[in-house]
Protein backbone atom coordinates (compact mmCIF):
# COMPACT_ATOMS: atom_id res chain seq x y z
CA UNK A 1 0.00 0.00 0.00
CA UNK A 2 1.31 3.45 -0.89
CA UNK A 3 -0.19 6.82 -0.10
CA UNK A 4 1.03 10.03 -1.71
CA UNK A 5 0.51 13.17 0.33
CA UNK A 6 1.44 16.73 -0.53
CA UNK A 7 4.46 17.83 1.53
CA UNK A 8 3.87 20.97 3.57
CA UNK A 9 5.69 22.59 6.44
CA UNK A 10 4.38 22.69 9.99
CA UNK A 11 2.52 20.29 12.24
CA UNK A 12 0.02 19.27 9.56
CA UNK A 13 2.84 17.89 7.44
CA UNK A 14 4.11 15.89 10.39
CA UNK A 15 0.66 14.38 10.85
CA UNK A 16 0.52 13.45 7.16
CA UNK A 17 3.91 11.77 7.35
CA UNK A 18 2.80 9.87 10.42
CA UNK A 19 -0.31 8.68 8.56
CA UNK A 20 1.73 7.53 5.58
CA UNK A 21 4.24 5.58 7.66
CA UNK A 22 1.46 3.99 9.68
CA UNK A 23 -0.28 2.78 6.53
CA UNK A 24 2.93 1.46 5.01
CA UNK A 25 3.88 -0.40 8.17
CA UNK A 26 0.35 -1.74 8.53
CA UNK A 27 0.68 -3.32 5.11
CA UNK A 28 4.02 -4.84 6.05
CA UNK A 29 2.60 -6.23 9.24
CA UNK A 30 -0.31 -7.84 7.42
CA UNK A 31 2.14 -9.56 5.13
CA UNK A 32 4.72 -10.60 7.71
CA UNK A 33 3.01 -11.08 11.06
CA UNK A 34 1.68 -14.55 11.75
CA UNK A 35 -1.67 -14.94 13.44
CA UNK A 36 -3.85 -12.49 15.30
CA UNK A 37 -2.55 -10.58 18.30
CA UNK A 38 -3.89 -12.00 21.55
CA UNK A 39 -4.50 -10.07 24.76
CA UNK A 40 -1.70 -10.26 27.33
CA UNK A 41 -1.46 -9.03 30.92
CA UNK A 42 1.33 -7.08 32.58
CA UNK A 43 1.40 -9.61 35.42
CA UNK A 44 2.01 -12.53 33.07
CA UNK A 45 4.53 -10.67 30.92
CA UNK A 46 6.62 -9.60 33.91
CA UNK A 47 6.62 -12.96 35.78
CA UNK A 48 10.10 -14.02 36.98
CA UNK A 49 11.90 -16.91 38.67
CA UNK A 50 14.13 -16.98 41.77
CA UNK A 51 16.93 -15.29 39.81
CA UNK A 52 14.64 -12.54 38.58
CA UNK A 53 14.74 -13.98 35.05
CA UNK A 54 11.63 -13.93 32.88
CA UNK A 55 9.34 -16.96 32.98
CA UNK A 56 6.95 -15.58 30.37
CA UNK A 57 6.01 -18.31 27.91
CA UNK A 58 3.40 -16.52 25.82
CA UNK A 59 3.40 -16.02 22.08
CA UNK A 60 3.73 -13.11 19.70
CA UNK A 61 2.07 -10.93 18.61
CA UNK A 62 0.11 -9.74 21.64
CA UNK A 63 -1.71 -6.64 22.82
CA UNK A 64 -1.23 -5.00 26.18
CA UNK A 65 -3.43 -2.25 27.62
CA UNK A 66 -2.60 0.30 30.30
CA UNK A 67 -2.31 3.91 31.40
CA UNK A 68 0.62 5.85 29.96
CA UNK A 69 2.69 7.02 32.95
CA UNK A 70 4.86 9.58 31.15
CA UNK A 71 5.05 11.77 28.10
CA UNK A 72 6.96 10.06 25.26
CA UNK A 73 9.96 12.41 25.58
CA UNK A 74 10.11 12.37 29.38
CA UNK A 75 12.69 9.60 29.84
CA UNK A 76 15.04 9.59 26.85
CA UNK A 77 16.15 12.09 24.21
CA UNK A 78 14.57 11.13 20.90
CA UNK A 79 16.16 13.97 18.90
CA UNK A 80 17.50 12.37 15.66
CA UNK A 81 21.17 11.54 16.18
CA UNK A 82 22.58 9.12 13.64
CA UNK A 83 25.96 7.71 14.72
CA UNK A 84 27.83 5.59 12.13
CA UNK A 85 29.26 2.16 12.94
CA UNK A 86 32.71 3.38 11.88
CA UNK A 87 34.33 -0.06 11.90
CA UNK A 88 33.18 -0.63 15.48
CA UNK A 89 34.48 2.64 16.94
CA UNK A 90 30.91 3.51 17.98
CA UNK A 91 29.85 0.11 19.26
CA UNK A 92 26.83 0.31 21.60
CA UNK A 93 26.27 3.99 20.68
CA UNK A 94 22.54 3.98 19.95
CA UNK A 95 22.11 7.67 19.18
CA UNK A 96 18.55 8.84 19.74
CA UNK A 97 16.38 6.74 22.04
CA UNK A 98 12.69 6.59 22.94
CA UNK A 99 10.96 4.97 25.91
CA UNK A 100 7.61 4.93 27.69
CA UNK A 101 6.06 3.06 30.60
CA UNK A 102 2.41 2.11 30.99
CA UNK A 103 0.61 0.50 33.92
CA UNK A 104 -2.32 -1.88 34.24
CA UNK A 105 -5.49 0.21 34.44
CA UNK A 106 -7.61 -2.34 36.31
CA UNK A 107 -5.48 -3.59 39.19
CA UNK A 108 -8.23 -6.00 40.27
CA UNK A 109 -7.65 -8.10 37.15
CA UNK A 110 -4.02 -7.24 36.36
CA UNK A 111 -0.97 -5.85 38.13
CA UNK A 112 2.28 -4.16 37.22
CA UNK A 113 3.57 -2.17 34.30
CA UNK A 114 5.70 -2.52 31.19
CA UNK A 115 8.28 -0.41 29.34
CA UNK A 116 8.48 0.06 25.56
CA UNK A 117 11.87 0.94 24.07
CA UNK A 118 13.29 1.90 20.68
CA UNK A 119 16.76 3.08 19.63
CA UNK A 120 18.00 4.68 16.43
CA UNK A 121 21.38 3.08 15.77
CA UNK A 122 20.83 -0.66 16.11
CA UNK A 123 23.61 -1.05 13.55
CA UNK A 124 26.09 -0.16 16.29
CA UNK A 125 25.26 -3.27 18.27
CA UNK A 126 28.10 -5.81 17.95
CA UNK A 127 25.80 -8.47 16.50
CA UNK A 128 24.73 -6.05 13.73
CA UNK A 129 27.77 -3.93 12.88
CA UNK A 130 26.36 -2.06 9.89
CA UNK A 131 24.99 1.41 9.17
CA UNK A 132 22.34 -0.25 7.00
CA UNK A 133 20.80 -1.71 10.17
CA UNK A 134 20.33 1.69 11.81
CA UNK A 135 17.59 4.25 11.17
CA UNK A 136 18.69 7.30 9.22
CA UNK A 137 17.66 10.60 10.80
CA UNK A 138 14.74 10.86 8.38
CA UNK A 139 13.58 7.29 8.99
CA UNK A 140 13.92 7.76 12.74
CA UNK A 141 11.78 10.90 12.61
CA UNK A 142 9.07 8.92 10.85
CA UNK A 143 9.26 6.21 13.52
CA UNK A 144 8.91 8.78 16.31
CA UNK A 145 5.88 10.31 14.61
CA UNK A 146 4.39 6.85 14.19
CA UNK A 147 4.69 6.13 17.92
CA UNK A 148 3.91 9.57 19.36
CA UNK A 149 0.54 9.97 17.61
CA UNK A 150 -2.53 7.78 17.47
CA UNK A 151 -2.84 6.64 13.82
CA UNK A 152 -6.62 7.13 13.71
CA UNK A 153 -7.26 10.36 15.63
CA UNK A 154 -3.79 11.96 15.35
CA UNK A 155 -3.99 12.51 19.12
CA UNK A 156 -0.53 13.18 20.55
CA UNK A 157 0.05 10.69 23.34
CA UNK A 158 0.67 12.06 26.82
CA UNK A 159 0.74 10.89 30.41
CA UNK A 160 -2.69 9.78 31.60
CA UNK A 161 -3.89 8.38 28.25
CA UNK A 162 -5.25 4.84 28.21
CA UNK A 163 -3.42 3.04 25.39
CA UNK A 164 -3.11 -0.36 23.78
CA UNK A 165 0.27 -1.57 22.54
CA UNK A 166 0.57 -4.29 19.91
CA UNK A 167 3.90 -6.09 20.36
CA UNK A 168 5.67 -8.27 17.81
CA UNK A 169 8.89 -8.57 19.78
CA UNK A 170 9.82 -8.53 23.48
CA UNK A 171 13.17 -8.88 25.21
CA UNK A 172 14.22 -9.50 28.79
CA UNK A 173 16.89 -7.11 29.96
CA UNK A 174 17.64 -5.16 33.11
CA UNK A 175 15.31 -7.28 35.22
CA UNK A 176 12.13 -6.73 33.22
CA UNK A 177 10.57 -7.84 29.95
CA UNK A 178 10.43 -4.91 27.56
CA UNK A 179 8.42 -4.41 24.40
CA UNK A 180 11.02 -3.63 21.73
CA UNK A 181 11.90 -3.99 18.07
CA UNK A 182 14.55 -6.59 18.90
CA UNK A 183 17.24 -4.12 17.73
CA UNK A 184 15.87 -4.54 14.22
CA UNK A 185 14.58 -1.87 11.82
CA UNK A 186 12.51 -4.40 9.83
CA UNK A 187 8.84 -3.25 10.08
CA UNK A 188 7.90 -6.84 10.93
CA UNK A 189 9.29 -6.16 14.42
CA UNK A 190 7.48 -2.86 14.96
CA UNK A 191 5.28 -2.30 17.97
CA UNK A 192 2.25 -0.05 17.54
CA UNK A 193 0.36 2.17 19.96
CA UNK A 194 -3.34 2.99 19.67
CA UNK A 195 -5.48 5.28 21.78
CA UNK A 196 -8.22 3.75 23.90
CA UNK A 197 -9.23 6.82 25.94
CA UNK A 198 -7.54 10.21 25.99
CA UNK A 199 -7.02 11.89 29.36
CA UNK A 200 -8.08 8.71 31.16
CA UNK A 201 -6.13 9.94 34.19
CA UNK A 202 -2.98 8.86 35.98
CA UNK A 203 -3.42 6.17 38.63
CA UNK A 204 -3.04 7.24 42.24
CA UNK A 205 0.54 6.46 43.29
CA UNK A 206 1.04 3.51 45.61
CA UNK A 207 2.37 4.97 48.86
CA UNK A 208 5.42 3.19 50.26
CA UNK A 209 8.57 3.77 52.30
CA UNK A 210 12.02 2.28 51.80
CA UNK A 211 11.19 -0.38 54.39
CA UNK A 212 8.72 -1.81 51.86
CA UNK A 213 11.44 -2.38 49.26
CA UNK A 214 14.73 -2.62 51.20
CA UNK A 215 15.74 -4.90 54.07
CA UNK A 216 17.25 -3.49 57.25
CA UNK A 217 20.70 -4.38 55.87
CA UNK A 218 19.95 -2.20 52.81
CA UNK A 219 19.56 -5.13 50.38
CA UNK A 220 16.62 -5.18 47.98
CA UNK A 221 13.53 -7.10 49.02
CA UNK A 222 13.09 -9.57 46.15
CA UNK A 223 10.01 -11.78 45.97
CA UNK A 224 9.67 -13.84 42.81
CA UNK A 225 5.91 -14.17 43.39
CA UNK A 226 5.76 -10.38 43.03
CA UNK A 227 3.39 -10.19 46.01
CA UNK A 228 5.79 -8.04 48.06
CA UNK A 229 9.01 -6.09 47.75
CA UNK A 230 10.44 -4.41 44.68
CA UNK A 231 8.88 -6.73 42.11
CA UNK A 232 5.43 -5.87 43.45
CA UNK A 233 5.85 -2.23 42.42
CA UNK A 234 7.89 -2.59 39.23
CA UNK A 235 6.54 -0.58 36.33
CA UNK A 236 3.98 1.22 38.49
CA UNK A 237 3.44 4.76 39.73
CA UNK A 238 4.52 5.01 43.36
CA UNK A 239 5.14 7.58 46.07
CA UNK A 240 8.12 6.93 48.34
CA UNK A 241 7.75 8.91 51.56
CA UNK A 242 10.27 10.35 54.00
CA UNK A 243 13.40 10.58 51.86
CA UNK A 244 16.47 12.78 52.21
CA UNK A 245 19.05 13.30 49.47
CA UNK A 246 22.61 12.15 50.14
CA UNK A 247 23.93 13.78 46.95
CA UNK A 248 22.45 16.06 44.29
CA UNK A 249 24.88 15.50 41.39
CA UNK A 250 22.21 13.92 39.18
CA UNK A 251 19.43 16.36 40.04
CA UNK A 252 19.36 17.88 36.57
CA UNK A 253 16.74 17.37 33.87
CA UNK A 254 19.23 18.19 31.10
CA UNK A 255 21.74 15.48 32.02
CA UNK A 256 21.98 12.29 30.00
CA UNK A 257 20.20 9.14 31.22
CA UNK A 258 23.26 7.77 33.00
CA UNK A 259 24.02 11.08 34.70
CA UNK A 260 20.57 11.71 36.17
CA UNK A 261 21.00 9.47 39.22
CA UNK A 262 20.80 10.66 42.83
CA UNK A 263 20.88 8.66 46.05
CA UNK A 264 18.30 9.15 48.79
CA UNK A 265 18.01 7.67 52.28
CA UNK A 266 15.29 7.14 54.85
CA UNK A 267 17.70 7.96 57.66
CA UNK A 268 17.53 4.38 58.94
CA UNK A 269 20.37 2.90 56.90
CA UNK A 270 18.40 2.28 53.71
CA UNK A 271 19.27 4.02 50.44
CA UNK A 272 17.60 4.13 47.03
CA UNK A 273 18.41 5.54 43.59
CA UNK A 274 16.30 8.29 42.07
CA UNK A 275 16.68 8.90 38.35
CA UNK A 276 15.65 12.43 37.42
CA UNK A 277 13.29 12.61 34.45
CA UNK A 278 13.77 15.07 31.60
CA UNK A 279 11.21 17.33 33.27
CA UNK A 280 12.03 20.12 35.71
CA UNK A 281 10.78 19.04 39.15
CA UNK A 282 12.18 22.03 40.99
CA UNK A 283 15.32 22.44 43.09
CA UNK A 284 16.76 19.53 45.01
CA UNK A 285 15.05 19.35 48.43
CA UNK A 286 17.32 20.21 51.33
CA UNK A 287 15.24 18.32 53.87
CA UNK A 288 12.78 15.45 53.99
CA UNK A 289 10.62 14.97 50.89
CA UNK A 290 8.26 12.52 49.21
CA UNK A 291 9.14 11.31 45.70
CA UNK A 292 6.55 10.38 43.05
CA UNK A 293 7.51 8.55 39.89
CA UNK A 294 7.75 5.27 37.99
CA UNK A 295 9.25 2.26 39.78
CA UNK A 296 11.92 0.97 37.42
CA UNK A 297 14.61 -1.70 37.32
CA UNK A 298 18.02 -1.54 35.63
CA UNK A 299 19.91 -4.66 36.73
CA UNK A 300 22.33 -4.32 33.81
CA UNK A 301 21.89 -7.99 32.96
CA UNK A 302 20.01 -10.11 30.50
CA UNK A 303 20.07 -13.21 32.68
CA UNK A 304 19.13 -12.05 36.19
CA UNK A 305 17.01 -9.37 37.79
CA UNK A 306 17.16 -9.23 41.57
CA UNK A 307 18.82 -5.82 41.86
CA UNK A 308 19.06 -2.39 40.24
CA UNK A 309 15.68 -1.06 41.32
CA UNK A 310 15.17 2.69 41.12
CA UNK A 311 12.54 5.42 40.84
CA UNK A 312 12.22 7.54 37.71
CA UNK A 313 11.47 10.81 39.49
CA UNK A 314 8.55 12.90 38.24
CA UNK A 315 7.71 14.95 41.33
CA UNK A 316 9.38 15.84 44.64
CA UNK A 317 7.26 17.15 47.51
CA UNK A 318 9.19 18.78 50.38
CA UNK A 319 7.98 17.71 53.81
CA UNK A 320 9.59 20.34 56.04
CA UNK A 321 7.83 20.56 59.39
CA UNK A 322 5.55 23.59 59.52
CA UNK A 323 5.44 25.79 62.62
CA UNK A 324 1.99 26.54 63.97
CA UNK A 325 1.63 30.26 64.57
CA UNK A 326 -0.92 31.90 66.84
CA UNK A 327 -1.52 35.44 65.67
CA UNK A 328 -3.15 38.18 67.68
CA UNK A 329 -5.77 39.82 65.51
CA UNK A 330 -8.77 42.03 65.98
CA UNK A 331 -11.81 40.04 64.79
CA UNK A 332 -14.65 42.25 63.57
CA UNK A 333 -18.04 40.72 62.72
CA UNK A 334 -21.52 41.88 61.71
CA UNK A 335 -24.58 40.08 60.29
CA UNK A 336 -24.64 39.14 56.63
CA UNK A 337 -28.35 39.97 56.40
CA UNK A 338 -29.52 43.55 56.26
CA UNK A 339 -28.05 46.66 54.75
CA UNK A 340 -24.57 46.83 53.31
CA UNK A 341 -21.85 48.27 55.49
CA UNK A 342 -18.15 49.04 55.41
CA UNK A 343 -15.78 48.99 58.36
CA UNK A 344 -13.99 52.22 59.11
CA UNK A 345 -11.32 53.02 61.67
CA UNK A 346 -9.68 56.00 63.34
CA UNK A 347 -6.96 56.53 65.92
CA UNK A 348 -8.69 59.53 67.52
CA UNK A 349 -12.28 59.37 68.71
CA UNK A 350 -12.45 63.14 68.74
CA UNK A 351 -11.58 63.32 65.05
CA UNK A 352 -14.04 63.38 62.20
CA UNK A 353 -11.59 61.60 59.88
CA UNK A 354 -12.39 57.87 59.46
CA UNK A 355 -10.61 55.52 57.03
CA UNK A 356 -12.23 52.56 55.25
CA UNK A 357 -10.65 49.21 56.27
CA UNK A 358 -9.83 47.44 53.00
CA UNK A 359 -8.96 44.03 54.48
CA UNK A 360 -10.75 41.08 52.86
CA UNK A 361 -14.19 40.27 54.28
CA UNK A 362 -15.24 36.60 54.52
CA UNK A 363 -18.42 34.94 55.78
CA UNK A 364 -18.18 32.64 58.81
CA UNK A 365 -21.33 31.16 60.40
CA UNK A 366 -23.56 33.81 58.83
CA UNK A 367 -21.37 36.69 59.94
CA UNK A 368 -19.29 39.02 57.84
CA UNK A 369 -15.82 38.70 59.33
CA UNK A 370 -12.69 40.76 58.86
CA UNK A 371 -9.34 40.54 60.63
CA UNK A 372 -7.07 43.45 61.46
CA UNK A 373 -3.80 43.83 63.31
CA UNK A 374 -4.19 44.46 67.03
CA UNK A 375 -3.67 48.08 68.04
CA UNK A 376 -4.46 49.88 71.28
CA UNK A 377 -5.00 53.12 69.41
CA UNK A 378 -7.38 52.01 66.66
CA UNK A 379 -11.15 52.39 66.90
CA UNK A 380 -13.73 50.86 64.52
CA UNK A 381 -17.26 51.61 63.34
CA UNK A 382 -19.73 50.33 60.76
CA UNK A 383 -20.99 52.76 58.16
CA UNK A 384 -24.13 51.94 56.21
CA UNK A 385 -23.63 52.25 52.44
CA UNK A 386 -27.17 51.69 51.11
What spans do the regions from the language model cover?
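Short, threonine-centered small-residue motifs that mark membrane-proximal processing/anchoring sites
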Residues: 37-39, 343
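Short, composition-biased motifs enriched in small/polar/acidic residues
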Residues: 319-386
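Bacterial N-terminal signal peptides
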Residues: 18-34
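N-terminal secretory signal peptides that target proteins for export/translocation
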Residues: 1-19
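Compositionally biased, intrinsically disordered low-complexity segments enriched
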Residues: 8, 13, 26-27, 42-44, ...
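N-terminal compositionally biased, intrinsically disordered segments and leader/signal-like regions
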Residues: 3-5, 23, 42, 210, ...
Amino acid sequence: MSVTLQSRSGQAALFRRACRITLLNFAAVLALAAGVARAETHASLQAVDANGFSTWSGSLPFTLTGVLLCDPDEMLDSTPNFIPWNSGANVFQLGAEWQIAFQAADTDSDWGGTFCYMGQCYGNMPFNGSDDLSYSNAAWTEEILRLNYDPVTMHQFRAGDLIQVTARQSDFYGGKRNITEGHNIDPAYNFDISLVTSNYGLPEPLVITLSDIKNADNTFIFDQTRATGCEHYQGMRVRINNLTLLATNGWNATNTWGNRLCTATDGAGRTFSLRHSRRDVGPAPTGTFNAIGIFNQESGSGVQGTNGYELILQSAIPQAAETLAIAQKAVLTWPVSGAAHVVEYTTDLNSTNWTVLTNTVIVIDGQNTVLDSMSNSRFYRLRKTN
